[in-house]
């Protein structure tokens, strides 16, 4: 065996396990599901504090007050709420809003992911198909009367069997007989009487 491990001598019969075929985690469904499931556990210890509540500006309010003595809290009827009250209210409002919002968002995404399943749901509805057991030209050709030996040959030639219904775009091609049918003389023909006289 050379130092070059890629070239192996025919004598080298050591069994080596075939290298497992590598597949990215996002292509393997189970691994990807476990990875997504474990993602929240890998979060760093330092957490981002929620964004402080932004001040709400009404549409009709001036973009910024001209004087420093007037703050947005005072603009409503020149009455200043106590700061502790404002802080208390804003904290509770932010908490309730964020918790309900996150809950709503989580439930919506959960329901959306439930709708996306791995195998598409195929809804089968039993639809009655009329006359499914009958072939395309079921009644054709119409039944012919059975042979009755009591009656002799007809005085007129039989018409050919009626043709099958044909809805082709072009004219029906002529029938091609792969093998000639048996020779049947005219039903009124008699070998004894109607034989051609030899000349």
Curated annotation (Swiss-Prot):
Annotated GO CC locations: nuclear speck
Chief subcellular location: nucleus
Composition bias, Basic residues: 56-69, 77-92, 102-119
InterPro entries, per the entry: Tra (IPR010519)
Ranges where the record places region Disordered: 1-121, 178-199
Keyword Nucleus in annotation: yes
Keywords: Differentiation, Nucleus, Sexual differentiation
Keyword Nucleus carried by entry: yes
One GO BP: mRNA processing
Biased composition range(s): Basic and acidic residues: 20-37
Cellular location(s): Nucleus speckle
Note on domains (UniProt): RS domain directs localization of proteins to the speckled subnuclear compartment and the purpose of this localization is to allow colocalization and co-concentration of components of the splicing and splicing regulatory machinery to permit relatively high rates and/or efficiencies of reaction and interaction.
Other remarks on this protein: The sexual regulation of tra occurs through a mechanism of sex-specific alternative RNA splicing. The non-sex-specific RNA expressed in males is not translated.
Biological role: Member of the regulatory pathway controlling female somatic sexual differentiation, regulated by Sxl. Activates dsx female-specific splicing by promoting the formation of a splicing enhancer complex which consists of tra, tra2 and sr proteins.
Annotated protein name in UniProt: Female-specific protein transformer
Lineage per the UniProt record: Eukaryota, Metazoa, Ecdysozoa, Arthropoda, Hexapoda
